[in-house]
Amino acid sequence: GKTADSEMLLENSLYGLPQGSAFTTKGQNTYESASAILGQQGYTSAVFHGNYKSFWNRDEIYKQFGYDNFFDASYYDMNEADVSNYGLKDKPFFKESEEYLSSLQQPFYTKFITLTNHFPYPIDEKDASIAPATTGDSSVDTYFQTARYLDESVKSFVDYLKKSGLYDNSVIIMYGDHYGISDNHEEAMTKILGKDYNTFENAQAQRVPLMIHVPGVQGGVQEQYGGQVDLLPTLLHLLGVDNKEYLQFGTDLLSKDHKQLVPFRNGDYITPTYSMIGGNMYNQQTGEPIATETKEMKETKEKVAKELELSDSVLQGDLLRFYAPDGFKKVDPSKYNYNKKKSTDSSDK
């Protein structure tokens, strides 16, 4: 699922399925998502995306999540010059989104899904502000140009947020949804990194950027092992929402009690000291193989397998239809309609 699995992790703190996309196969399930939880705290919710609403079954599963608004490609000027790869380029996407964002009733919870910095990383010459890399692998070479283009589009959007007054009144989370370059590009990545792009290095390349802006908080770098499954608990705590009664597999990244264990969907995992990659153990700090699996490592492997099994049970059995925390009202998907409309007030549901 990649992107769709990432959204499942972000919105629900549930893992994707071992096969297929839960967005497609479990699109009618009951969920206790970020948009539903925050909606019952008075937040208007919206998704902005420069592709069409049916992609990844978003037009159906977002109703199960309780999203008030979904601004898909039908809301944007999809002229040929501004469309590339999977949809609208990031710069016109953010620019055209400003009007819709400003029309939302505050407070709001919104999500922007960008497209330009996505495999195979095509970019028009007029949009590239830096030279490509020179590995001879076109996808690796243009990756950096599309990343720079994304950076420039985000800067322009942040400038708008500051000018409009939203920046100083918003928690902003920026993250990557999945890896950029797969292990099929080993030779080119070896040239880029200046070292062998082996199994261990490929696992490290699964890391994605995560930046959190909180008004009034001094910026800095926090060294922490975590995954996308931890984003929802972190966001809820930043907004003062108690998540103890919700079924979530992640923990608050900013808490002293955060568990520094990152499960992969295939049962592999990473910790600050050791990792299991492809069933083999490695020293996480040096990348050196570990010949003998210790008792602690075996217990960690079993813990990861159990956590994935429990998450699968929730999705496969649609178990959240049987449970809701006190005070939480289950989402009624029939209230939501994402056909293009003039008003974006949440009362139009």
Identify the meaning behind each predicted range.
Residues 1-349:
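Solvent-exposed soluble domains appended to multi-pass membrane proteins
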